[in-house]
Amino acid sequence: MLDHLEIAGRNFSSRLIVGTGKYKNFDETVKAIEASGAEVVTVALKRVNITDNKRESLQDYLDPKKYTYLPNTAFCFTAGEAVRHLALAREIGGWNLVKVEVFSEKEFLYPDMRETLKAVKILAGEGFHVMPYCNDDPIMCKRLEESGAVAIMPLAAPIGSGLGIQNLFNLKVIVKQSSVPVIVDAGVGTPSDAVIAMEAGCDGVLINTSIAKARFPVQMAKAMKHAVRAGRLGYLAGRMLPQQFASPSSNSSGIV
């Protein structure tokens, strides 16, 4: 059965998106990403080195023809900053599918939703396909979609915390109301967290720190790949209805 993740008319067979930061070196980055099976990788614009061809860059290790680069605006604190960064990325790198991150403060890195919404409106109006990092607030998620977002990326917990999904109910509401893909972003710490997100009906999961900072990143990347697949299959299969009584696996007929 074909079950592709579709974002802005692009089809991907993997529902796992991975980040490229926090690894020990580029070699480890490549090995982990290959093990994850991901086709989309998020990159901070400073890591793709779009202005200095002499300096070592991620593109030297991860072929942009093989992977879809999803440039993000990490550590932007205003809509204007984010828009300027992505305009430069499109001009030099040709990237049109982008991830918008506009932080409100530096300790917990929660998104500034007012500035995020502003950035989405501007970028969508300029022809970008925008995937915004956002709070798990159903109302704001709907407004982002109505403003032109091609996918919604609510956090599970603060970026890099590994705390897992803190508000599963809100995620389910966001999934139910959305007509664009919902991709859980930030806070996924374990493969079981990824399974929970996918079983809840989310369309994908973005993971970076829990792979990069695992004791064995390549093994964790493989685990996350299988977790996302298992959760998706479980969601499509449809879980049994829970009940408040026991039900034996075999009946008692024919027992002497």
UniProtKB/Swiss-Prot annotation:
One of its GO terms (molecular function) is thiazole synthase activity. InterPro entries: Aldolase_TIM, Thiazole_synthase_ThiG, ThiG. The keyword Cytoplasm applies. Its EC number is 2.8.1.10. Gene3D superfamilies: Aldolase class I. One of its GO terms (biological process) is thiamine diphosphate biosynthetic process. PANTHER family: THIAZOLE SYNTHASE. Belongs to the ThiG family. This is Thiazole synthase. It comes from Neorickettsia sennetsu (strain ATCC VR-367 / Miyayama). The lineage of its organism: Bacteria, Pseudomonadati, Pseudomonadota, Alphaproteobacteria, Rickettsiales. The gene is thiG.
